[in-house]
Amino acid sequence: SDYIADHPEVSGEEYETSKKLVETLRAKGFETEYPFAGLETSFRAIYGPNDHKYKVAVLTEYDALPGIGHACGHNLSGAISLLAGIAASGIQDELDCDIHVVGTPAEETDGAKCGMCNQGIFKNYDMAIMVHLYDQNLVYCRLNGLSCIQYDFYGKASHAGASPWEGRNALNAAMLMIHGLDCIRGCCTPDSRLNS
């Protein structure tokens, strides 16, 4: 973390940072692909025979912001994710799970994860996890594929005959949202669900 903080590199230019992370993983016995996924500062590190039932990608972020360094905390997030991958690799047999550490650069701009998804990099993983800092001391888990969001619609009452233009019909807004979701649903692939 200290090395990354002392050598901030902006999105897509994380050459020394990615090199340091890869060197650390190699020193711990990981085999690495570097560069990876067509990105000069990305990597994938695999520990052991890679023959367990499940596969987990531990994602690391390590880019800095222009002019202000690691204000988003990727120096810590990346280091913690790296250490989590190293620690989990020691119990792969008990978990029946292969642990792969995947470097995801350029998260403050384009977001390398999006391009990696489009390339199918994550298709063979059962789960992808990562650490990111927050302004509170807590553990927070969100499964984006299983998110449930509640929307509340509020209207404004008015007299239907004397001044309907002063009112706001919450049901109209709710119906527009439901119709919009229904239009999007037709574009979803079979492995995605969008319910309303």
Residue positions per predicted region:
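Acidic/His- and Gly-rich active-site-bordering loop/insert found
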Residues: S1-D96
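Histidine/acidic-residue-rich, glycine-tolerant segments that coordinate divalent metal ions
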Residues: T41-I46, D63-A71, N75-L76, L82, ...
